[in-house]
Regions:
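Substrate-recognition/cap regions that form aromatic- and gly/pro-loop-enriched pockets
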Residues: 334-473
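Short, well-ordered beta-strand elements within core beta-sheets of diverse protein domains
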Residues: 125-131
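Histidine-centered catalytic/metal-binding microenvironments
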Residues: 452-564
Length: 564
């Protein structure tokens, strides 16, 4: 009984959603190297298949309805009114360069509404992308949808960007039987970066008398009852100006800090040298102050020491806490080959003491991830690039998908395989083949993966201005030709990448099979003068690992006579 109680208490203290754990980084125009706005999103779930969603622009009759299918389960939740025109959406970016990502934080369990609500968090994202030309309009659409039809999910953080602005929006339901949601949306100040990773991060904010949606000077929107609802529940009783959304509706716990805010901190400390002072907080040390709110939290947004590029964000999405006290490659759990991953569960118990593994940004169970880049100096179909990838961000390649494309590559298309159906033609399975083989001898194989990964992403970065300029010239003459051009480029680039990555997998299997390492010379495996394979390298285990084996084996491996 004691064991069961301790695990129950742990779950309550952690307050962490194990099924859907994601990471978002947000970059404003003034914080990016070229004036882009950018957001990232890693969709991490153990049952999520990585594929590139696409819906074309459509016109509908006045009486049209649309089914709402829950993203997580594919369950039909209900039907809602369709609008007269929807915009095309590739992945999580629409034709007007609006992009949306999310992370689930859960929050107070009594505020979930899984019976009377119709619209889940996934549907909110894609319905908003189909209906909004700007980030502000997307927030308005989201709020209107859950007010009219009810919110079906638990607490969510959204990243919402367009070619000029970046917003963070956090919401949570009102509990069973109540429509609407409690929410706040804040404009990230220009020149700053923000992040969220499964822990609500909005604390205090400037209360507004009304949501004046198209007033460009208004930088805060929120539910009118976001404070009064908490008062009525007895969860908050002091001044409105001190009200903290997160501390009331989703208080940070050990798990919220260690498994979630740790990822935010790791990004922040990589872009700002002053963020080291929040290491204790990120490790799970929560200090409480006024109103019992956490007083040692990180700021919601920070100014980076230097401006950030899309390629920088790709690197930050590959983080395993390297160089910190929580570096996942440096303890015994990494094994002899410094593997920066730990298989689930996140927590485990020995002699009635509960321990945890780290939860880094890069993780094995990523279905897909992206870096969305919106550029206001180009026509919309060309200005938006959805840098898309499947599987673990650490071992994948971000390939460019211009937001104006009219089809997606077959290797990434919906229906090409699924999580239970292997396909050599599917990007998800090809990248998983490489990553999962790499995990088996990580410190060696990751070097080969990095060479290819960096070569592809460097080439794509160098080609981008060339493709941009060619597409822009075509667009001035004939927009349809420009869209055909960027579609062909995006599709062919991605399909060719998958073919090349499949070859990388074959190379890695050949080179590292059976624990050996084949010798190479001038890009070819070595053979003897007679054409026979050269003897492989067998570097053995590192000394520190061998010492651990000796320490824990009670002398049973000691050689006490001739070894052969």
């Amino acid at each position: 009984m004691k064991k069961h109680l301790s695990l129950l208490v742990l779950i309550l203290l952690i307050g962490f959603n194990y099924t859907q754990a994601c990471t978002n980084f947000l970059v404003t125009k003034g914080a990016s190297v070229d004036g882009s706005t950018m957001i990232t999103y890693a969709a991490d779930a153990h049952v999520l298949y990585g594929e590139l969603y696409y819906t074309p622009a459509m016109d509908y009759p006045s009486n049209a309805m649309v089914d709402v299918i829950e993203w997580d389960t594919k369950k039909l939740l209900g039907t809602i009114k369709q609008v007269s025109h929807t915009y095309s959406v590739v992945g999580n970016m629409n034709e007007h360069q609006v992009s949306i990502g999310e992370t689930t934080y859960g929050g107070r369990p009594e505020l979930s509404n899984f019976h009377s609500g119709i619209v889940d968090y996934g549907s909110l994202m894609w319905l908003a992308l189909q209906r909004a030309k700007t980030a502000r309009e997307a927030i308005k659409v989201i709020a209107g949808l859950f007010d009219e039809y009810g919110y079906y999910s638990s607490g969510e953080s959204f990243s919402i960007s367009d070619k000029n602005e970046v917003w963070i929006m956090e919401l949570i339901g009102k509990g069973e039987g109540q429509k609407g949601a409690l929410w706040v949306a804040l404009l990230v100040p220009d020149g700053y970066v923000c992040a969220h990773a499964n822990q609500a991060r909005i604390t205090t904010f400037n209360y507004q008398e009304k949501n004046d949606w198209f007033n460009e000077s208004q930088t805060v929107f929120h539910a009118p009852d976001v404070v009064s609802f908490a008062r009525a529940k007895g969860w908050y009783s002091v001044k409105d100006k001190d009200f903290s959304f997160s501390d009331v509706y989703a208080p940070v716990s050990f798990g919220g800090a260690r498994f979630c805010e740790m990822r935010v901190w790791s990004f922040f400390k990589d872009v700002n040298s002053k963020m080291g002072k929040y290491a204790d907080y990120a490790s799970g040390v929560i200090k409480h102050g006024k109103n019992e709110f956490a007083k040692n939290r990180m700021p919601l947004w920070i100014k980076p020491d230097k401006k950030v590029s899309a390629q920088d964000l790709m690197k930050y999405m590959r983080d395993h806490l390297e160089g910190t006290d929580w570096d996942m490659s440096k303890d015994i759990g990494a094994g002899p080959w410094e593997l920066p991953y730990r298989w689930r569960p996140l927590t485990w118990e020995v002699d009635s003491v509960v321990y945890c593994n780290e939860r880094a940004t890069a993780t094995q169970q990523t279905g897909f991830s992206f870096v969305s880049q919106s550029r206001n100096w180009l026509p919309d179909p060309i200005g938006g690039i959805h840098w898309f990838s499947v599987d673990d961000a650490n071992t994948t390649v971000y390939t460019p998908m211009y937001c104006g494309i009219t089809k997606v590559p077959e290797s990434y298309a919906v229906g090409n395989g699924d999580l239970l159906t292997f396909s050599w033609d599917a990007a998800f399975w090809v990248f998983n083949f490489v990553s999962n083989w790499t995990y088996s001898r990580y410190s060696y194989m990751i070097k080969d993966v990095r060479v290819k990964q960096q070569a592809f992403e460097k080439k794509y970065a160098e080609l981008t201005p060339v493709i941009d300029n060619a597409a822009k010239t075509l667009y001035a003459q004939n927009p349809e030709l420009a869209i055909e051009f960027i579609t062909n480029y995006s599709v062919n680039t991605a399909n060719n990448l998958v073919d090349d990555w499949r070859e990388l997998g074959e190379f890695l299997l050949t080179k590292y099979i059976d624990g050996n390492i084949k010798k190479e010379k001038e890009g070819m495996f070595e053979r003897t003068a007679t054409g026979y394979p050269a003897g492989p390298d067998q570097p053995g285990y590192p000394d520190w690992w061998l010492k651990k084996v000796v320490e824990t084996s009670n002398g049973k491996f000691e050689v006490k006579g001739a070894a052969h």
